[in-house]
Amino acid sequence: MEDQQRLEEIVNQLNIYQSQVELIQQQMEAVRATISELEILEKTLSDIQGKDGSETLVPVGAGSFIKAELKDTSEVIMSVGAGVAIKKNFEDAMESIKSQKNELESTLQKMGENLRKITDIMMKLSPQAEELLKKVRGSGE
């Protein structure tokens, strides 16, 4: 009976770890998506820098666009969260984007390390569970 209890404990632990793995993977995907958005923003700003007066397409929703003329590319209005946006000059905006990307890449790396640690623990627990399962099945016959 002792083996049965230990097996149940390990299976419960494995289930908890599996849930953590799935959650971390989802969070990592969200971070990757944000990094990708920042890279697109960075490229777009680089492409329009100094192109005052040029025509561009502006998204207005539902996959629709209108033509617009760039008036001033020296300043960027950036969201800082909680519905708040601030005006930054071009250089500060680019620096802010790079800083955010670096922070997110560091976070992604830490998440990857946590994922590896949990996976390592699971790899150690799985053989224990298999061994206990064999014992429990063997004693039950």
Swiss-Prot record:
Family matches, as InterPro entries: PFD_alpha_archaea, Prefoldin, Prefoldin_subunit_alpha
Domain of life from the UniProt record: Archaea
- Which ranges does the record mark as transmembrane? none
Molecular function via GO: unfolded protein binding
One GO cellular component term = cytoplasm
Note whether Magnesium occurs among the keywords: no
Q: Where in the cell is it found?
A: Cytoplasm
* GO terms of biological process kind: protein folding
| UniProt KW Acetylation keyword | no
Q: Which UniProt keywords apply?
A: Chaperone, Cytoplasm
- Name a Pfam family for this protein: Prefoldin
Q: Which PANTHER family match?
A: PREFOLDIN SUBUNIT 5
- Quaternary state and partners of this protein? Heterohexamer of two alpha and four beta subunits.
Show the NCBIfam families listed in the entry. prefoldin subunit alpha
The family annotation for this protein states:
Belongs to the prefoldin subunit alpha family.
State the function annotated in the UniProt record: Molecular chaperone capable of stabilizing a range of proteins. Seems to fulfill an ATP-independent, HSP70-like function in archaeal de novo protein folding.
* Protein's name according to its UniProt entry: Prefoldin subunit alpha
Annotated source species: Methanothermobacter thermautotrophicus (strain ATCC 29096 / DSM 1053 / JCM 10044 / NBRC 100330 / Delta H) (Methanobacterium thermoautotrophicum)
